[in-house]
Regions:
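ABC-family P-loop ATPase nucleotide-binding domain
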Residues: 1-25, 268-274
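The feature captures the beta-strand-to-loop junction immediately N-terminal to the Walker
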Residues: 50-52
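Helix-to-loop junction immediately C-terminal to a conserved catalytic motif
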Residues: 65
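Conserved ABC ATPase "signature" region
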Residues: 126-159, 207-210
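Catalytic Walker B motif of ABC-type/P-loop ATPase nucleotide-binding domains
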Residues: 188-192
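A short, surface-exposed alpha-helical micro-motif characterized by mixed small hydrophobic
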Residues: 229-231
């Protein structure tokens, strides 16, 4: 137990760690967004990263994906230290991160979006892909059948030639998952994959994420919906004020609900999914 009375943040997960952070920090204009976060992501499991707004969740995901450097601390993928590696090097180790549709990806068709995913996973930057349209054409020759199959599975086949920016919010979430599957990662980082979608689509996306786990993918997802965490996540990391407040299963965190609620206020109710 930690001095906070919750589960020890440094406690090793039951399985081998696919990802590990040791004391990472990141400050912006002297204010710490992440302040000594330490945790492990169990291999082959779905882990939820939860906490109130401003807890440092997105900053942690940015650091893990190589989109941002940490100021101090260490990061590992398996046994390989990847502290402050650029994103293209981290991608080559099998890590893929979904993100909100950028202006550049929004200008591509739905099919082209899927075709960029293997290029990203191979370490190509988006800028390089856009400057070399022949790369997407090559991917279409080699992988169009697989991409169209995925679009059919995710209900986006009829939108294959539409610009991604024209999709609805829910369709964009499905496209993010389809891109991730197309990339065939070992580790997947999801930033609020079910935010702003209706309950029926939440259930569908949850099923797709469980399918990824069944295929051997390790998933780390930022999630605010504790019902979703209860239904599909194996492990939970709670961040508060840039620190790891607690780790474990949601059932374990409920045993410390009073302490957790004292730090998280009404933003996250650990009993909400009970």
């Amino acid at each position: 137990m930690s001095e906070l009375g919750v589960l020890d943040p440094a406690r090793p997960a039951a399985r081998a760690a696919a990802l590990r952070c040791d004391g990472i920090t990141k400050a912006f204009q002297g204010v710490h967004a992440v302040n000594g976060a330490t945790f492990e992501i169990p291999d082959g499991q779905i882990t939820a990263l939860i906490g109130p707004n401003g807890a440092g969740k997105t900053t942690v995901v940015n650091i893990l994906s190589g989109a941002m450097n940490c100021d101090s601390g260490r990061e590992f993928i398996g046994e390989t230290e990847v502290t402050n590696w650029p994103s293209h090097r981290i991608a080559r180790l099998g890590l893929f991160r979904t993100f909100q549709l950028s202006r550049e990806l929004g200008g591509l068709t739905v099919l082209e979006n899927l075709l960029t995913a293997p290029l990203h996973q191979a370490g190509e930057s988006l800028v390089n892909v856009l400057l070399r349209p022949g790369l997407i054409a090559r991917e279409e020759r080699e992988h169009a059948e697989r991409a169209l199959e995925l679009l059919d599975i995710y209900g986006l086949y009829h939108l294959r030639d539409a610009r991604a920016r024209e999709l609805s919010g829910g369709q964009k979430k499905l496209l993010e998952i389809a891109r991730a599957v197309m990339a065939a990662p070992k580790i997947l980082l999801l930033d609020e994959p079910m935010a702003g979608v209706n309950p029926a689509l939440i259930e569908r996306i949850g099923g797709y994420i469980l399918d990824l786990k069944q295929s051997g993918v390790t998933v780390l997802m930022i999630e605010h919906n504790l019902n979703v965490v209860e239904q599909i996540c194996d492990y939970v990391i709670v961040l508060a004020e840039g620190r790891t407040l607690a780790t474990g299963r949601l059932s374990e965190l409920r045993e410390n609900a009073e302490v957790v609620r004292a730090y998280l206020g009404e933003v996250i109710d650990v009993d909400a999914a009970h």
